[in-house]
Amino acid sequence: MTLDLQTTIEQAWENRANLSPVDASAEVRDAVEHTIDGLDLGRLRVAEKIDDQWIVHQWIKKAVLLSFRLHDNAVMGQGPLQFYDKVPTKFAGYGEAAFKAGGYRVVPPAVARRGAFIARNVVLMPSYVNIGAYVDEGTMVDTWATVGSCAQIGKNVHLSGGVGIGGVLEPLQANPTIIEDNCFIGARSEVVEGVVVEENSVLAMGVFLSQSTKIYDRATGKVSYGRVPSGSVVVPGSLPSEDGSHSLACAVIVKRVDAQTRAKTSINDLLRA
């Protein structure tokens, strides 16, 4: 079934300029809808870790992009929260039984789009989770945090207030941003452009990471890009230019996570009781 979906999506992608809400075959519509349903239920993922390597399923990302060409804007929502969009909200039509079955908590006015997967024991404070995102078990998405399209958030992650996790749709990116298990992302931090924050890492408040951000390891003096090694404690910093005339912002790995640092983040358990 998945192979058939992939083949149909790949063929439709090559013909995407000719697709519209009134000009698309039933086969293409069904393939896109099945893919979005799979994302919504967590049966499909844009990226998954296989043998310790993140594998990106580009065809699934293409299905997400194609879905925007197959639908017109429509009024959705209820009460004071009315929207005009092409993608319905994930929780449209949910009653108490559906929320209990999902096993997560959604605090108003949190919004998740259909096609985002929310796992059990996730807490969505007033936040936004975009289509194609995957939020794994036990994660807290705090107030005004944003999980971008197709972003992958691991288990027991805390995305603090105002955190931005970049998406892949606008601007178009090749790979999703990934936050692995047991990470703590400090308030107002931004992680974008397919950067990977490996498991058990802690980002202090106000850390900004893109593919062009220098990541300086204080212990080794080495500079890297695009990936925070597992167990890192990262703070905002700056590095001087070669001639010393100016400095540019960077992220600094100040140490590896120890038991004391992890203990400080366990306060999140109190917020979920």
Swiss-Prot record:
Pfam families: Hexapep_2, THDPS_N_2. One of its GO terms (cellular component) is cytoplasm. InterPro entries: DapD_Trfase_Hexpep_rpt_fam, Hexapep, Hexapep_transf_CS, THP_succinylTrfase_dom1, THP_succinylTrfase_N_sf, Trimer_LpxA-like_sf. SUPFAM superfamilies: Trimeric LpxA-like enzymes. It is an enzyme of class 2 (transferase). PANTHER family: 2,3,4,5-TETRAHYDROPYRIDINE-2,6-DICARBOXYLATE N-SUCCINYLTRANSFERASE, MOLYBDENUM COFACTOR GUANYLYLTRANSFERASE. This is 2,3,4,5-tetrahydropyridine-2,6-dicarboxylate N-succinyltransferase. It comes from Bordetella pertussis (strain Tohama I / ATCC BAA-589 / NCTC 13251). The lineage of its organism: Bacteria, Pseudomonadati, Pseudomonadota, Betaproteobacteria, Burkholderiales.
